[in-house]
Every structure is written in structure tokens, then in C-alpha cells.
Amino acid sequence: NLAAQWGLNAAGFSNGAAYVDLDNDGALDLVVNNLNAPATVYRNRARDLDSAGHHFLTVTLRGYGANTGGVGAKVMIAAGGSHQLVEVMPTRGFESSVDPRAHFGLGATSRVDSLTVIWPDRRSQVLENVAADRIITLSQSDARSHPPTRPSAHPPLFSDLTDRLPISYKHADNTFFDFGREPLMPHLLSTEGPALAVGDVNGDGRDDMYAGGAKWQAGAVFLQDAAGRFRATPQPAFRADSLDEDVDAALFDADGDGDLDLYVVSGGNEFWEGAPLQDRLYLNDGRGNFSRAEAGAGGALPVFFHNGSCIAASGDFLFVGSRVVARQYGVIPRSYLLENDGHGHFRDVTALKAPGLDSVGMVSRATWVDYDGDGKLDLIVVGEWMPVRVFHQENGRFVDRTTEAGFAGASGWWTSIQAADLNGDGRPDLVLGNLGLNSLIRASRAEPARLYVGDFFETGTLKQILTSYRHGVSYPLAGRDELLQAMPSLRSRYPTYASFGASRIQDIIPRKDLKQARVLEADTFASAIALNRGDGTFELHALPAEAQFAPIYASLAGDFDGDGKIDLVTAGNFYGVTPLEGRYDASYGLLLRGDGRGGFAAVDMEQSGLAIDGQVRHMALLKRANGDRLIVVAKNNDRLQLEQIAPLH
């Protein structure tokens, strides 16, 4: 801490600061706003004390019309073998601004090789061999040419067909605030829909799709016609179940009659128990008309109520994952392995054939894949506060081989999983979506994120305290106000914010309560791929930085650019967080070009054409009647988005 050495250690209550070169000496001064006191002005004496002869350049812009300051312009310099860029955006909040001029520190370099300004109207001007240590003024009226653009050798790989191929569907999630029940839970769990499934449901050889509904919104089946358009079909059974919230779905032949039936997972975090949390199996009459199969004794499904998260279907088995126990975030919910008798009747065989799978964790997604090439499908499950869990099929049972597969030390907030051969060796690899690295919450093996779950101070309600490391110390993320709301008895111990200060969880919670608490850990938040070594183990590799900007809720693998190598499309975002954490909205969809060896590089938006905003929950590949390939994107509280993939040549 160099505050005292730099002269910035004056006591006060400050809520704003701005940098500005007030005396035009090339050193940025500091103005600090104080409550109930005059503003403080700190003169920067760096130039007075500079013995190394450092240099600067300040650029003032004069723009057109009302934009007199050239706001939005980009100023770039090349000097001393390095490049710098300043985008003129001086606003820093309500009625707040920094110095609107572009300031460049040049170090020992006394001349700028080139200075380029790109104005908001895309015109530009270039100056060369500019002397340092001065303020220069450039006017937009002197800009005479547009900047050179790099010609594109190929059109974008994706084009948005959403408006040209309209589908009469928009997910309409109801408003429910999970924090009202559990104020200390890390994030909402009530925005996990909509479900999405693709398949030929009426036997005409064309792909159709199912889009799930929210509470009080029925799901819908869309049949594709010969022109490649989609129309909704009447489904009375869906309307009867419109109270349920559809978070995942799968199309498969459940009853062995040759057509695709529909399994829909009920979830959300609003319902405590009862019928809205019962999964549903809808049987197909072969023409795309669905009727609900009964649950219970003699029915198609066993009766179970859960906050479901996913469905993974294989030939004989269904894995149904659960995310949370209502009002008890952090308690491991029950998940299910269901076995099909071949005629559409499923029984719960979890305890019999997959010991430990019932309490596998807070499940997000799962997939079936024969990862070791023995001809039998294995189950891989991902979720929050858990490693990638591997259940290997052995003699008709599923045995936990997580440690043997190499995933024991990879606990995260995993959000999605996709199996594909990413490096061309004939073995299935995994694409694993996670929280990403653009988060206030950090996690590593040395400094994991932790969740302490317990009835602290014995108030009769379960509470969750999330901690993360800062400067080598693990602190709760919740502030004094949030903790006092959940545990009012703390008020006498922490009457002021100063008294709460840098309190650790062991300072806040009694030792006996901490000993009894359930502690969950996460040590990696990076989205990754897991390459199959061929010996029953996987090797994790983080995806490129561009894939870490937001959580990845959906991914697709395929050769999207026609070079014969597997590429990836990823999408995500998540808004249901506290203001402190800040919503995750930095993903606009991403194409990752594969090199055929398991390496991936991000493709810029101009080349890919992808622009997928919003909270993506599922993506699926679909073939149109004319042979064109589409990506269908299901987004929370939004329309279905359709992205056409450029034909392969």
C-alpha cells in the first residue's frame, strides 16, 4: 500500500474520483469527491520528480455538431515499438467524467511514429513523426478518408434467420425472486428454461422441434413443412400441464412403436412440492400428436417430485438430474436412474444399478457416451459444487470412476456438457461449460470458493455463506446488510460497517456451527475441454480467453467452416445474481475454430456472423427441408433464434 508514500492517505468519506491534467504538464492529477467536505485536488508531481526524462502526448479532439468532444472516437499511436489505443469515452457515471482528452505516456520515446484518429462517422486521419511533450488538437473537419477495411475473403459462416423464418413462440418466464426465500443463496435457480428438443416427430423425414414453456405457459411442438417453415400444432396435453415449468426435454422412442416420444423435465425453484414438480412422458401417435402417460403404480413413470435440471436418454436408461432442494440451496437433491422395460414403462433402479448416483450432486447436465470403447454407454454428469462425475457401466451396473478418469480435482460450477471427437483420434472428448473467469468470485485449488451451509445461530432455517479469496484470505461475499437480514443476532456484534470490516467467516459464525456445517468447494471456474487419452482418463484444457467471458450453458460441436476439423459454437449468459456480483452478459455467441488436434481459436464476430445475446439455455442442430443446416437457440424469456450455417464446400 503506497497511499502514504504517494500523499493519498488523507482520511475522509469519498465516493468518486476523476483523473485530469489540470496544469497541462503531462501528468494526470486526481480530483476526489468527499461527502460533507470540499473536494480534494491532488497535484501529480511526477514530472517534477522525473529524472529519467519520460515523455507524453495529449490529444484534444474537436468533433462535428453536438458531439464537440469527438466522443466515441478512437485514438491510436505507434511509438518506440509499441502501440496504444484510447477510446474517447469520458463518462464514468451520473454527471461524472474524466479528462476528455486522450493522454499517452511514452516513457523514454520522444517522438510518435504515427497517430491515427478514427472518428465516429468512420472517417480517419493520420499524422506521422509527431513530437512529444505537447498538447495537439485535431478536428473532425480535417478527416478526409474512411479507414481502409480488410476485404472479407468469404461471407460470414452464420446468418440470422429469426426474422425471415418466424416461429410463433416466445418464452415468457414469470417473475419469481428466489432471494426472497433464501437471501444468501449465490444466485437464482428459477430461470433455467426453456427446454428444447429436435427430432422428426411425424415421420415425414423432416426435423421438427419442441420448445418448453414457463409457469402458466404450455410447451409447443413445431412441425416443419416442405418449404422449411415451422408451424405450431394443437397439443391439449401440453395446455393441461401449463402450470409446470419445462427446463429440459428429450425426444426418443420410449414405447418401442417406432416414433419419437417426449420426456419433459419439471423444474424451476418456485414450487416446494407436488404435481408441478413431476416429470412428464408424452406418447406420440406417430403423427406428432402427444398424450400424457400416467405416472404411479402401473404407469409409465414412477412418482417423484423434484426441482429437475436435465434428462439424458440412452437405449435402455434415462438419467434424470436434480438441481436443488426447495428452500435448501446447498443440500444435495435426489437424482434418478430409470430403466425402460421396452414398452414405455420406467422403474427407478438408482439404488440397484447405480449406487451413489442418487446423491451425485447439484446436477446441471449429463450425457451418455462410451468413453472407453468397450461398446457400452457410460454416464457423465456435471453440476454446481461438484467435479465432472463419471459412472462407468460394468456388468449392468454403473460404478463411480470419477477419480480414475482424472476429474477428482476439478470441482466447479459446471453448466453444460457435450461429447464429440475434438482431435480426430476416434475417441469421444468432452466440451464442459462452466461459470467462466469473468467473475467477482474466484476459485483455484490453492484458494477455492467455498459455500458453508447450515442453520447458523439455530434460527430454524438453512443459510448459505459463500466465500472467496482476496489477497490470500477467504472472505464472505455477502456484506453486513445481507448477513444481518438472515441472522439478526449479529447486529449487536456488528453495530457499524467498520466493526464488520474485514471479518472472516470464522469471526462471524460460532465454531460449533461451523463444525456442523456442510462445506462445498469449487476449485475451477474455467470452461474447458477434456481430451480422452484412450486409457480411461481425460486431460482438462481451458478454452481460450474469449470463451471465459460468461457462463457457457450450451455448446455444439461440428465442422462449421468446411475444413474437415471439428469446431465449437458456445453460448450462455446468466442474469440471476446479486448486484454485488453483477450479471453475466458478455457472451454474444462464439465460434471456436478447431485445429484438428484439440486446440481451438476464437473467430471474430465479423467473420463468424454469430450474434447470440440474451440468456441462452439450449442449442440444437436442425436440418431444413432443403438441406440447409440451422442452429436453434432457446433463450430464457425470449424468442427462439435461428442461425443458418453456411453450406460446406
Regions found by a protein language model. Name each.
Residues E294, G298-V369, G375-L377, V382-E384:
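Solenoidal tandem-repeat scaffolds enriched in leucines and small polar residues
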Residues F238-D248, G267-A312, I332-P333, V349-L357, ...:
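Asp-box/WD-like beta-propeller blade repeats and closely related beta-sheet repeat scaffolds
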Residues D29-N34, L115-T116, D208-G213, A250, ...:
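Hydrophobic beta-strand segments that make up the repeating blades of beta-propeller
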Residues N1-A195, R229-F230, A354, R397, ...:
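Gly/Ser/Thr/Pro-enriched helix-cap/hinge segments flanking short amphipathic alpha-helices
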Residues N15-D23, E192-G203, L223, E245-G256, ...:
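Beta-propeller blade termini
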Residues Q278-D285, P333-D341, H392, L451-V453, ...:
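Beta-propeller blade signature
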Residues L8-G12, L188, A240-D244, A300-H306, ...:
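Short glycine-/Asp-/Thr-/Trp-enriched loop segments that recur within the blades
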Residues P38, K215-A218, G268-W272, V324-Q328, ...:
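Short glycine/acidic-enriched loop and turn motifs that connect beta-strands
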